[in-house]
Amino acid sequence: MGCVKSKEDKGPTQKYRPDPTNPTPGSHMGLYGPDPTQMGQSPALKGPTNNYNSRSSGLTPFGGSSSVITPFGGASSSFSTVAVNNPFPGVVTGGVTFFVALYDYEARTSDDLSFSKGDRFQIINNTEGDWWEARSINTGQKGYIPSNYVAPADSIQAEEWYFGKMGRKDAERLLLLPGNQRGTFLVRESETTKGAYSLSIRDWDEMKGDNVKHYKIRKLDSGGYYITTRAQFDTLQKLVKHYTEHADGLCYRLTTVCPTVKPQTQGLAKDAWEIPRESLRLELKLGQGCFGEVWMGTWNGTTKVAIKTLKPGTMSPEAFLQEAQIMKKLRHDKLVPLYAVVSEEPIYIVTEYMGKGSLLDFLKEGEGKYLKLPQLVDMAAQIADGMAFIERMNYIHRDLRAANILVGDNLVCKIADFGLARLIEDNEYTARQGAKFPIKWTAPEAALYGRFTIKSDVWSFGILLTELVTKGRVPYPGMVNREVLEQVERGYRMPCPQGCPESLHEMMRLCWKKEPDERPTFEYIQSFLEDYFTATEPQYQPGDNL
């Protein structure tokens, strides 16, 4: 946020045309929040087939879903993108249906219940948000449990191999992690067919090496399931059991369920939003910027968190608290979740702790120095995924750059500090010309006239792409801010960085179109990047002997 000090080839093949049926979002100059011109607009943008502003275009027919919510499965994958009371709508939880724990959980407060994977619960109250009051069948104790850690007993959500609402690309990321063998698999909701599922399997062959095959599991009118018409099953469970015993037309027999990663809880605990400063312990300083510091710390003596401390006067506590209420509802697996706040100055912002730090430091000084283009493009695709969600929610980031992306294990990237830049009251920042303002990342219409929209975020994303491929080099090397502003206004754009494919540079240049509404959507950018190395392959494999 603000000024942070930092310790093959597939291209767009058709001429980019703006879509007259898809107007750009209105300016968000004065307000970070829903765009009143877009309220009621369908999230599925429609447009001509060769339009970069729509991912439903024919240009990327094999694109993964931009609506992935949680990459690591479990019941959390049933959550919507904003706060909900019951992730299992229609399930009676008042003692009629029992729930089973999908993961271990260690109580964080005296009101919580500790439990182990496989424990069973009777739900007493599930109407108060993300933490449910429950009674453990195993111990008889009552307390609160995170609702995304449980699923109805004997349901498909309770199966270890079921990963819920997960996109194709995230399934591939998980299955291709080191340690997984050929035949490792998962089942997820189909992105393209309502009521259907997809089976994703890790495979290997001499030509492609390790890869993932996807099979559509179709539903019969009678209620059964099949991949190939000659092998039909009453339940998904029976289908999975069959293919663990025989490949029977698949690329390989199902051998091992894909290991999952325990999801983040939605918030620290029940009613732990505005928290006392004393409940936080600052332990290790991770970084320092113009407006504050970032620490690794512990909440309530139990939970590791990241804590951003803001210098007094950086922003109004009232405005921040109002903004934070919006930010905590923006839930997506590629956004750093906001856990809690200390709302009196000095303001503290409590978020998930990401072990590898900022993307900028990771590229310059960490393991990122050794990454090759496929990994860098995949990280860019993850960031585009998070920004596509912000785009669908009609919000804007305002300060998108590598310093504001955080990295976790297995090259997971999450977007941080979305929306906070609007609240900064520092004169050197608000003037947009001072040393604290990130001119080199900012679209000209935003830097000169304060016209911040999702399309100015697209411009910033193009700059972020240069940071990725150059391993953290400052944009416009050798140029000062004023010079950058003048040159960009005259039409100057950064040349193709060394080692960067021309097709990727072409995407950067699309992001830097002078007219904001000629820049692509994040939905399109995500699709382009996810399929950068695989655009010639079909999304789903046919089973043999269909």
Curated annotation (Swiss-Prot):
It catalyses: L-tyrosyl-[protein] + ATP = O-phospho-L-tyrosyl-[protein] + ADP + H(+). A lipid is attached at residue 2 (N-myristoyl glycine). ATP binds at residues 286-294, 308. Autophosphorylation at Tyr-429 maintains enzyme activity. Palmitoylation at Cys-3 promotes membrane localization. Residues 1-58 are annotated as: Disordered. One of its GO terms (biological process) is cell differentiation. InterPro entries: Kinase-like_dom_sf, Non-receptor_tyrosine_kinases, Prot_kinase_dom, Protein_kinase_ATP_BS, Ser-Thr/Tyr_kinase_cat_dom, SH2, SH2_dom_sf, SH3-like_dom_sf. A lipid is attached at residue 3 (S-palmitoyl cysteine). Keywords: ATP-binding, Cell junction, Cell membrane, Cytoplasm, Cytoskeleton, Developmental protein, Kinase, Lipoprotein, Membrane, Myristate, Nucleotide-binding, Palmitate, Phosphoprotein, SH2 domain, SH3 domain, Transferase, Tyrosine-protein kinase. Transmembrane segments: none annotated. Residues 48-58 have a biased composition (Polar residues). The modification Phosphotyrosine is found at residues 429, 540. Residues 1-18 have a biased composition (Basic and acidic residues). Residues 161-258 form the SH2 domain. Widely expressed. It comes from the Eukaryota. CDD domains: PTKc_Yes, SH2_Src_family, SH3_Yes. One of its GO terms (cellular component) is cytosol. Belongs to the protein kinase superfamily. Tyr protein kinase family. SRC subfamily. PANTHER family: TYROSINE-PROTEIN KINASE (PTHR24418). This is Tyrosine-protein kinase yes. It comes from Danio rerio (Zebrafish).
